[in-house]
């Protein structure tokens, strides 16, 4: 049980997908202007990461490895991600049409989010079992959500602040992201 907790804390804080592994930077910068869209994107991405971790483990363990088709891992995982994202899009369209409209183009772009493919490949490389894969996927989503929501709230405050003209927009966003990354480096010694 403590191994699962350490995996969760390690993935959320120490090995954060956005600030340490630099995965998922496109939605991190693109959806972080308003906190409402950031929260919606966080839920959708966490759901997709968790479900993709489980399904990609099953596909790898019970289809690709027994049939000796390991060379098709990347293509297989891309197909799994596309199916999971389409499923998520249909569920969100039925349950929350407002959020579906707010996310707009970013929802289908989850398919091309490198964090999701990176998660599937890292699960295989780190030799996680089924439960560890699900925990790893969920904690990657929680870490992504934490960083995205905090960053979007900081960007909202920065938009209302008096910032020198050369630093407005993307410049101050990159500086803020760098400072957040430095702050998360403080968790490095937390898990060994």
UniProtKB/Swiss-Prot annotation:
It is a multi-pass membrane protein. Keywords: Cell inner membrane, Cell membrane, Electron transport, Membrane, Translocase, Transmembrane, Transmembrane helix, Transport. Pfam families: Rnf-Nqr (PF02508). It is an enzyme of class 7 (translocase). Its EC number is 7.-.-.-. One of its GO terms (cellular component) is plasma membrane. One of its GO terms (biological process) is electron transport chain. It is found in: Cell inner membrane. It comes from the Bacteria. The keyword Membrane applies. The chain crosses the membrane at residues 5-25, 39-59, 63-83, 102-122, 134-154, 171-191. InterPro entries: Ion_transpt_RnfA/RsxA, NqrDE/RnfAE, NqrDE/RnfAE_oxidrdctase. The complex is composed of six subunits: RnfA, RnfB, RnfC, RnfD, RnfE and RnfG. Belongs to the NqrDE/RnfAE family. Part of a membrane-bound complex that couples electron transfer with translocation of ions across the membrane. HAMAP family: RsxA_RnfA. This is Ion-translocating oxidoreductase complex subunit A. The gene is rnfA.
